[in-house]
Amino acid sequence: MPGVIPSESNGLSRGSPSKKNRLSLKFFQKKETKRALDFTDSQENEEKASEYRASEIDQVVPAAQSSPINCEKRENLLPFVGLNNLGNTCYLNSILQVLYFCPGFKSGVKHLFNIISRKKEALKDEANQKDKGNCKEDSLASYELICSLQSLIISVEQLQASFLLNPEKYTDELATQPRRLLNTLRELNPMYEGYLQHDAQEVLQCILGNIQETCQLLKKEEVKNVAELPTKVEEIPHPKEEMNGINSIEMDSMRHSEDFKEKLPKGNGKRKSDTEFGNMKKKVKLSKEHQSLEENQRQTRSKRKATSDTLESPPKIIPKYISENESPRPSQKKSRVKINWLKSATKQPSILSKFCSLGKITTNQGVKGQSKENECDPEEDLGKCESDNTTNGCGLESPGNTVTPVNVNEVKPINKGEEQIGFELVEKLFQGQLVLRTRCLECESLTERREDFQDISVPVQEDELSKVEESSEISPEPKTEMKTLRWAISQFASVERIVGEDKYFCENCHHYTEAERSLLFDKMPEVITIHLKCFAASGLEFDCYGGGLSKINTPLLTPLKLSLEEWSTKPTNDSYGLFAVVMHSGITISSGHYTASVKVTDLNSLELDKGNFVVDQMCEIGKPEPLNEEEARGVVENYNDEEVSIRVGGNTQPSKVLNKKNVEAIGLLGGQKSKADYELYNKASNPDKVASTAFAENRNSETSDTTGTHESDRNKESSDQTGINISGFENKISYVVQSLKEYEGKWLLFDDSEVKVTEEKDFLNSLSPSTSPTSTPYLLFYKKL
């Protein structure tokens, strides 16, 4: 029996593997858990992982060799700012780059922005007037394009100056985002919403058209303000003159009291105040005050109260006139208006008096206390317009004052100056005038019609080419001769013969005759924009690209210098030089890519000259600018182009302004460089505290000269310290100017955020290629030399 048991145990042990096979799934799961708890396997896995990590480290080490590439990129970075593509916005970026380098455009936008900022400050002062508020909110919306352009110019110049002073901070690209301007364009024209491709010429016309409308609106408001000046009379008399005026009032009131009682019944005066307009209300009201002054000597207290109540009711009609003058000043005006009203009492007020009153405005001249003032009186103006016998302007003079009439025409030259140039920004730079002449072939009479233009659309191939293609069965693309830009302009200004059914009706001959029609240039702008008609309607094979407008890749020989004397109405010696080109690469108008090539010819237009930097540094150190809420929206009210470099190396207050602008609003820098630029201004703010405090100590010590020798020594030390800082800053400016002069006369290729330098030979080859490439010039910009 005991021998049987081992045999059974052996059998069981041998039979156990069969059970394992039957329960293999569960047993393998338990076995996997045991293996997971085994440390020997984990050690082997760690050894394998360490070997794998070592192999990875060996592979990562060669990747560190990419640093020389970054160094090369940093060395290849140019001190010119590109524009980030915000979704098929290459059409906008190319136009903005051309406008930025257009001579006179930045200064004109800056001047318009200063006018708008002053108007905004004036609107803040008049915010309590609810009637005018609704009208001027719409005008403020039209000003947004100027503000957006100015903020973009500021951001570009600020980024350019920061790169020139600290080039090691930028390794990838030098670009900013025109997001605010794009949003403004989308508000002005909903066509630009979304991310579709648009025509560069259309967006140029949209920008210039809105700028022109804004200039016209500003000009109308300026003329309106000049016309409203006569209604706002300001008087600042000397105290002695006030006493003389009061004495004259008492004498005149005693002298003319009986005349007032006879010629001015109470009922008529009250009715005039209810029915008449303008200054007649004021005259009747003042005449009542004269009566009250005379009767107060004999009236009781109750009567005085009653008359005072009647006198307090008219100010509700004209609160502004009363609030602007103090108590002695209206009294000084009472005698003057009273005598004038008596002088012209027989005349009825007419519409002519309202127009005559517009010819006078208030002037405040003289030295210190002396004042010269004009008062507008409709009756006196009417008498002046009818008889021309009055020589002292409006009204009689009081003993202490001299009245001098000032005409509106005499004030216009004062307001013209820079503002008139700013209001005509588009007209002066881009707008010219064409003359359409029609000559009758029978009587040789001429008729002319003038039209304004902002660009010239010229063909790039002959119109008969399509007919040749239809009739030709040999080649679908027949070879044509190379055309030139002068040929294209001659086609634009060609002489057209009107014959057949399109005959011209001559007013001299009184019947339809044959005629010749020509188009000539009468007035030429500073910048001529030539639009090459590279897109034409074609077959259905291009409908899939949208619009059915295919690209004409016919090359056109474009000269660097151009003269339009041949097509001008009068002889001229003006010549134009090519300074910018917008290129288009693609096959249709709704697809492809736009780039801009600009020639750097005038570095002074970049506002980076040495004098402006030093002056702005002294101003910035002495007077730091406050931080306003509007600056968070990207518009700096007191900011100008000359403060670009000082923002980088100036005091701490403007650096805060820039930090807030970079973080919150317009996103001056695109992509990763906003953080780097933010850190740049924070690091640059510490050394500026020393200069600002030193300059403050210098000014404080100068005001107190009797404070002792210690303060004088401190003054010398602080002045020496500021002198060292300024001299070091001048060295930086000279280095910046010298570095920019290297690019004088070179062509820059702006491909959105990328900026490259192209040789003149390569540029001419791309401008006038020998073959028919897909990249062809689309807009040519010539400036007057």
Swiss-Prot record:
Localization in the cell: Nucleus
InterPro entries: Papain-like_cys_pep_sf (IPR038765), Peptidase_C19 (IPR050164), Peptidase_C19_UCH (IPR001394), USP1 (IPR033815), USP_CS (IPR018200), USP_dom (IPR028889)
GO cellular component: cytosol; nucleoplasm; nucleus
Region (Disordered): 1-21, 33-52, 258-336, 693-723
Induction record: Down-regulated following DNA damage.
Keyword DNA repair: yes
EC assignment: 3.4.19.12
Compositionally biased spans, kind Polar residues: 7-16
Gene Ontology terms describing biological process: DNA repair; monoubiquitinated protein deubiquitination; positive regulation of error-prone translesion synthesis; positive regulation of receptor signaling pathway via JAK-STAT; protein deubiquitination; proteolysis; regulation of DNA repair; regulation of protein stability
Keywords, alphabetical: Autocatalytic cleavage, DNA damage, DNA repair, Hydrolase, Nucleus, Phosphoprotein, Protease, Thiol protease, Ubl conjugation, Ubl conjugation pathway
Residues bearing the modification Phosphoserine: S16, S42, S67, S313, S475, S768
Main location: nucleus
Biased composition (Basic and acidic residues): 258-275, 286-298, 708-719
Effect seen on changing E444K: Strongly reduces interaction with WDR48 and activation by WDR48
Limits of the USP domain: 81-785
GO molecular function term, any single one: peptidase activity
Outcome following mutation: C90S: Loss of catalytic activity including autolysis
UniProt record similarity statement: Belongs to the peptidase C19 family.
Remaining remarks: HEK293T cells expressing reduced levels of USP1 show a higher level of ubiquitinated PCNA and an increase in point mutations upon UV irradiation.
Quaternary structure and partners: Interacts with FANCD2 and PCNA. Interacts with WDR48. Interacts with ATAD5; the interaction regulates USP1-mediated PCNA deubiquitination.
Protein name: Ubiquitin carboxyl-terminal hydrolase 1
